Every structure is written in C-alpha cells, then in structure tokens.
Design a protein with these regions (language model features):
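Transmembrane-lumen/periplasm boundary regions of multi-pass, lipid-linked membrane glycan transferases
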Residues: 177-328
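Transmembrane-helix motifs of polytopic, lipid-linked glycan transferases
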Residues: 84-104, 142
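Transmembrane-helix signature of polytopic, membrane-embedded enzymes
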Residues: 4-9, 97-119
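Membrane-interface alpha helices of multi-pass inner-membrane proteins
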Residues: 125, 158-173, 318-323
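Short acidic/glycine- and proline-prone juxtamembrane loop motifs at membrane-interface regions
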Residues: 122-136
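Membrane-interface transmembrane helices that cradle and orient dolichyl/undecaprenyl
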Residues: 1, 102-103, 108, 143-161, ...
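Extracytosolic helix-loop segments that constitute the early lumenal/periplasmic catalytic or substrate-binding loops
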Residues: 15-17, 33-56, 63-66, 70, ...
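Transmembrane signal-anchor helices characteristic of membrane glycosylation enzymes that use polyprenol
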Residues: 3-31, 208-225
Length: 360
C-alpha cells in the first residue's frame, strides 16, 4: 500500500514538525496557564495542591501537571520542556493506533492508522498548543488497544497494561477517559459476543492496578479539598475532590454548571470535525458512511473481517458529547485514533479491491 521507505520518511517529517513546534512560545489560555501550574509545583515543591493563579483549582486532575512538573525538574523550566510529555504521549497514541489497527485488521492498516493519526490537524496542533488532551488521547487509545488484545487473546499482561493506561487517562482528565474506553470495549464485546471474558479472574489484578494508578490523584484531592470543607470553590463549600472526580466533573460540563454554557449547538462537533481531521476528513466521512451501510446490510452479524470498536465507539461517543453545554474543539481529540483506524481500513479496502488505478 505504501513503501516502507516512504512511510518512515513521512513519519520522520511529522516528528520534525512536532520538534519544531516545541520551541514556539506557549499559547494562552490553557497551555501557558497549565505550564504555570506545573511550574508552581516545582518552585514551591508542592505536588499536592492545584492552583490556577491565586484560586484553588478543582477541574482537571493532577496527572498532566505532574508530568509537566517532572519534565521541568529534569530539563528546567522551558516552553519546550513543558511540551515533552504531550509529544511522548502522542507517539504512544500513534504506536497504539498501529497496534490496534494491526490487531483488528493487518499490519498495513496499523501502519497507515498511525500515520493518519499523527498528521491529523488537531493532533499536530495539540503538540504545539499542549493541553491535557495529548496525554488523555495517548493513554486512552493505549488502554483500548491492550484491553481489546486481552479480549482476543486472554493475555494477563494486556489487561494489566490496559488498566494502567485507563488509570493514567482517568488521572489526566477524569470520567471522559473511562467513558471512551468503556464504550469501545462494550462495543467490541457486543459485536464479538465474548462476554465470558468479563468473568475471568484476570479482572482482579487489573482492578487492583487501576486502583493503585489513580490512588495518588485521589489522595492529593483528599488532602486539598476533602479535609478542608471550609474552602469555597465556585461559590460552594464542603467540596469533596474525590466525589467531584467520580461524579460531578462530567455532569458539570454536560449541564454547563460550574463552567457556564458556551454552545448549545448539537452539531458543534460535526462542523468542528470537518477541520480538526484535515486532510483526512472527506475520506473519514466516506469510511463512516460505507461502514454503516455494511453493518446494516449484515444486520450486525459478526464477521471476523470487520470490527465494531471504531464505528460503535465513534457513533455513541459523538452522540453523547454533542449534548454537552460546554464544548471546545479539542474535545474531539480523544476520538481521532478511532477515526484514524476506520479511515485506514476504508482506504486499504479501496486500494485492495478497486480496479481503478487512479484510486490506487
């Protein structure tokens, strides 16, 4: 489909773009503010309390700021040092796209999935304007890949790595990580009918690993908020950080409470997708349309050559997040790996079965 030399040349070009973007001045609002939050951790040697300016911060959990602070500790406080964890997480996400694409289809689709993911406009931007979504996206697709690998092969290592990835993603942005990972896994289980995998003893060590991974974040929230009911956060006292991250966070964004409403447009993410996935948008829309037609024609009967992780995950998650009253374009980033694999599988089928040399 694409020669190895050309493929690695294109990957190298993308990495060069990522590296060049490391030295750009940090953008306002989020990137610069998040970097300052991590810088405060290092300068005050306080890795428990989150502050945004003078205000205590109860929104996104600690992992992104810890990783940035760790980078500052090693390399010093620089714009480029802040971006290193996000870029590494993106490379992990690209490798996970390769792994999941190879697992669900074949090696060629896996390689092309990684390239599509790395070159999508919003992913390139997310490595320059680094927010929490770079780490969230990388570890979410890593978790999905490992958990699907467990369902297919019963690997203990895979389910433990999947649980670890889910824990890091949850500690980065909260419930949205578990929603995305959980729905993708449920879609795979529903399509393959491998429900017995949920009865395995291997879930016990996986749950333990997930709990250990999120424990530092929960402990930090407990110390900052739960033991200080007198603190007033967004006009309310008696705020529990643990209750917030397990329950309140996503509901506040869906309802617009706490953050305000910035868009009630149900189609916001559709017209946002038209530019965030450039230059692959049109092909992705065609891939989605033809895959829906295929599943309807098959009446959703299981066929080994197809998978429902990407199509099901995209459809359900797109529908859910469209109801949110607080929307921003980079909220789409976590779905880009799924679109990349779906897009790659569509183009591979066109290349393999089309008799039109122009398409090839």
């Amino acid at each position: 489909m694409i020669s190895s030399v050309r493929y690695w040349f294109l990957v190298a070009l993308v990495v060069i773009v990522y590296v060049a973007g490391m030295f750009v001045t940090l953008f306002e609002n989020d990137s610069a503010q998040f970097a300052v939050m991590a810088m405060r951790m290092v300068q005050e040697n306080d890795f428990i309390n989150l502050f945004k300016g003078p205000q205590e911060y109860l929104d996104k959990p600690h992992m992104h700021y810890w990783l940035a602070a760790f980078s500052f500790k090693i390399f010093g406080i620089h714009d480029w040092a802040y971006r290193i964890p996000g870029i590494l997480a993106t490379l992990l996400g690209a490798y996970s796209c390769y792994g999941l694409g190879r697992l669900l289809y074949n090696k060629d689709i896996g390689k092309f999935s990684a390239l599509i993911f790395m070159t999508a406009q919003t992913i390139v931007l997310s490595n320059i304007d680094v927010r929490t979504d770079a780490v969230l996206t990388g570890f979410s697709i890593f978790s999905i890949w490992q958990l699907v690998n467990y369902l297919e092969k019963g690997s203990l290592t895979s389910i433990i790595l999947g649980a670890f990835g889910a824990g890091v993603a949850f500690s980065t942005k909260g419930q949205i990580a578990l929603l995305v990972i959980g729905i993708c896994i449920l879609c795979h289980l529903a399509y393959t009918r491998k429900w017995k995998s949920l009865l395995s003893w291997k879930l016990i060590p996986a749950i333990l690993v997930f709990s250990i991974t999120i424990a530092p974040m929960l402990y930090a929230y407990y110390l900052q908020f739960d033991v200080h009911p007198e603190k007033v956060i967004r006009g309310r006292s008696n705020r529990s950080g643990i209750f917030f991250i397990f329950w309140e966070q996503s509901f506040e964004r869906l309802s617009g409470q706490g953050h305000g409403k910035n868009s009630s447009d149900f189609f916001f993410f559709f017209h946002t997708f038209l530019w965030v996935f450039l230059p692959w948008t049109i092909l992705a829309l065609l891939a989605y349309w033809f895959r829906v037609k295929t599943f309807i024609k098959l009446r959703f009967q299981y066929k080994p050559q197809y998978e429902f992780v990407t199509l099901g995950g995209i459809t359900i998650l797109f529908f859910i997040i469209s109801f949110a009253q607080f929307k921003l374009p980079h909220y789409m980033n976590i779905l880009i790996p799924l679109y990349s694999i779906l897009d790659a599988s569509y183009m591979h089928s066109k290349y393999r079965y089309s008799k039109d040399n122009t398409i090839k």
